[in-house]
């Protein structure tokens, strides 16, 4: 039987989240590969924005650019806006033992919005560039407002904040 982890004693993992707007003002989302959380529980194909951890001594903006490239191959971007605040979410108790080795209670994220200035052929998710592990099996452009309705439930409140933070940020080319 697995030991129960006391979430309140664990720190949040510092990470970044990335919105990429296309020339029509739609946002890039990727469909996560199936994640096996526990032998009895599987999370199938949820959509999410690119995100990832901030390395030691790395600035959040640099981490955002790195994570975006590692997960999507996208490099042709221009910064539109950095979120004013950090947003956080907690992992559900039942997945803490499987996510990030039980070291974190959740993630605290700095979010960035970018304008995609490249060609669609630049986007490579499976496999992503430079031997990085694939995280997505499909991608599409969606309206910013739809994001909270397509993500896993424990991230929904953060995505609602992201929509509020970045609504009106897209200026077009």
Curated annotation (Swiss-Prot):
Superkingdom of the organism of origin: Bacteria
Instruction: Read off the InterPro entries from this record.
Output: Nudix_hydrolase, NUDIX_hydrolase-like_dom_sf, NUDIX_hydrolase_CS, NUDIX_hydrolase_dom, RppH
In terms of SUPFAM superfamilies, this protein maps to:
Nudix
What cofactors are annotated for this protein? a divalent metal cation
Which terms in the Gene Ontology molecular function aspect does this entry carry?
bis(5'-adenosyl)-pentaphosphatase activity; guanosine-3',5'-bis(diphosphate) 3'-diphosphatase activity
EC number(s)?
Answer: 3.6.1.-
Supply the CDD domains for this chain.
NUDIX_Ap4A_hydrolase_plant_like
- What Gene Ontology biological process does one annotation of this record name? ribose phosphate metabolic process
Question: Mind telling me which PROSITE patterns this protein's record contains?
Answer: NUDIX, NUDIX_BOX
A Pfam cross-reference name:
NUDIX
Keyword annotations from UniProtKB, A to Z: Hydrolase
- Intervals of motif Nudix box: 52-73
- In this chain the Nudix hydrolase domain maps to 11-164
Protein family according to the UniProt entry: Belongs to the Nudix hydrolase family. RppH subfamily.
Q: What does this protein do?
A: Accelerates the degradation of transcripts by removing pyrophosphate from the 5'-end of triphosphorylated RNA, leading to a more labile monophosphorylated state that can stimulate subsequent ribonuclease cleavage.
Against PANTHER family, the record matches this protein to: NUDIX HYDROLASE 26, CHLOROPLASTIC, UDP/ADP-SUGAR PYROPHOSPHATASE
Protein name listed in UniProt = RNA pyrophosphohydrolase
Organism source for this protein? Bartonella henselae (strain ATCC 49882 / DSM 28221 / CCUG 30454 / Houston 1)
């Amino acid at each position: 039987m697995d030991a129960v982890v006391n979430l309140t004693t664990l720190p949040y993992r510092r990470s970044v989240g990335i919105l990429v707007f296309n020339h029509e003002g739609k946002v890039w989302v990727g469909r996560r590969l199936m994640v096996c959380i526990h032998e009895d529980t599987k999370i199938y194909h949820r959509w999410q924005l690119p995100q990832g951890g901030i390395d030691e001594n790395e600035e959040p903006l640099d981490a955002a650019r790195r994570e975006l490239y590692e997960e999507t191959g996208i490099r042709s971007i221009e910064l539109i806006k950095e979120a004013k605040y950090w947003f956080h979410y907690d992992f559900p108790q039942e997945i803490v033992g499987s996510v990030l080795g039980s070291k974190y209670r959740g993630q605290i994220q700095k979010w960035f919005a970018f304008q995609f200035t490249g060609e669609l052929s630049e986007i490579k998710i499976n496999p992503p560039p430079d031997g990085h592990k694939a995280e997505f099996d499909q991608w599409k452009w969606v309206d910013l407002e739809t994001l909270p309705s397509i993500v896993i439930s424990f991230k929904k409140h953060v995505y609602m904040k992201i929509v509020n933070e970045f609504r009106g940020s897209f200026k077009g080319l």
